[in-house]
Every structure is written in C-alpha cells, then in structure tokens.
A protein has these predicted regions:
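Glycine-rich beta-strand-turn "strand-cap" elements at beta-sheet edges
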Residues: 2, 9-11, 38-49, 76-107
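Short acidic-aromatic low-complexity motifs
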Residues: 12-13, 33
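Short, conserved charged micro-motifs
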Residues: 13-19, 63-65
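Hydrophobic alpha-helical segments with strong N-terminal bias
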Residues: 18, 22, 42-43
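An amphipathic, aromatic/His-enriched active-site/gating alpha helix that lines ligand/cofactor pockets
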Residues: 24-37, 47, 56-90
Length: 107
C-alpha cells in the first residue's frame, strides 16, 4: 500500500467550503482512480487554517498515475479555499488497520 500526504493552508473562514469541496468535487474524482482505496482529511482545531489529506493507494504506480493525470484538477478545485500550493509527500505504508476495519464492516 502507498500513501500520498497533502498539507495545505486554508484561507480564513473557509473550513465549511473546504469540506464541501472535498465531498462534492474531490472524492468523486478520487473514487474513479485506479488503485484508490481511501481518503482521510484533517483540519486543525481552532482557526482551522491548516489541513492535511492522506490518500491511500494499492500501489505506488497508482498514486503516481493520479498525480501526473488528475491531481491538477484537484489543485484547481482547492484554489478557492487554499492559500498557495499544497505540499505533497509520498510514503510507503508499513502498517494499517484499514483492511481489517473494512472486513469487519462488510461482515
């Protein structure tokens, strides 16, 4: 499994619009990507101007294909709520309970 960690600075007072953008524009796009497994989004408490999105992928190649293909659409959608350019870092997943959780929910 592979992960992409995107950190961003949200414009002031855009927390609700950020959540709507994730739900209505970004998640539908991600769900169409080959190898996509999950997206976890965090917003810092308080001012709510720091956000992190972690996407999980079957393989490194799936994440790379997304970043070279559809990711610019995500950046464009986020431009209305994000200051600057999001910072992307990639990681190999060494441990996760995601698949165990999914199996329990399906049972």
């Amino acid at each position: 499994m592979f992960s992409s960690h995107v950190s961003m600075h949200l414009k002031p007072n855009t927390r609700a619009e950020f959540a709507q953008t994730i739900e209505n524009e970004i998640l539908p796009l991600l769900r169409k990507q080959h190898g996509f497994q999950d997206e976890i989004v965090f917003v810092a408490p308080g001012s709510g101007t720091e956000g992190v999105a972690i996407s999980l992928w079957d393989k490194k190649e799936d994440a790379e294909a997304y970043h070279s293909g559809s990711y610019p659409e995500v950046v464009k959608a986020l431009a209305k709520v994000v200051d600057g350019t999001p910072e992307v870092r990639n990681f190999e997943v060494t441990h996760s309970t995601l698949q165990e959780t999914a199996a329990r929910v399906a049972a």
